[in-house]
């Protein structure tokens, strides 16, 4: 797990730029508000497929990365297999760290 990416995820949450929860994430994606979809690698296959397909359809970058517990801890919430970043700059920064 990339510590810099986790730090930026935490900063994004503190700035109010992370959407979590299945319904809220779906709404953010379909409304065009989402800039990056992060899906935990230990999320269910159904969740991975659902959010991967939805973000692909709306042409929003998505990444299967990290564990549910690590993502949840970074954003200060329990049991969050999906997180949506709604700020382009922070989304780009997180993707940059993940690609290093």
Which residues does each predicted region cover?
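N-terminal positively charged helical leader segments and presequences
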Residues: 30-53, 59-61
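C-terminal structural segments of small proteins and small subunits
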Residues: 69-100
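Mid-chain, well-packed structural core segment of small domains
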Residues: 52-80
């Amino acid at each position: 797990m990339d510590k810099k990416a986790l730090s930026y995820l935490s900063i994004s949450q503190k700035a109010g730029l992370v959407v979590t929860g299945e319904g809220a994430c779906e709404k953010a994606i379909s409304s065009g508000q989402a800039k990056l979809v992060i899906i935990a690698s230990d999320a269910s296959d159904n969740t991975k497929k659902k959010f991967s397909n939805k973000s692909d359809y709306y042409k929003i970058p998505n990444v299967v990365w990290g564990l549910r517990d690590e993502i949840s801890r970074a954003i200060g919430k329990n049991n969050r297999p999906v997180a949506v970043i709604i700020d382009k700059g922070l989304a780009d920064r997180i993707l940059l760290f993940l690609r290093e």
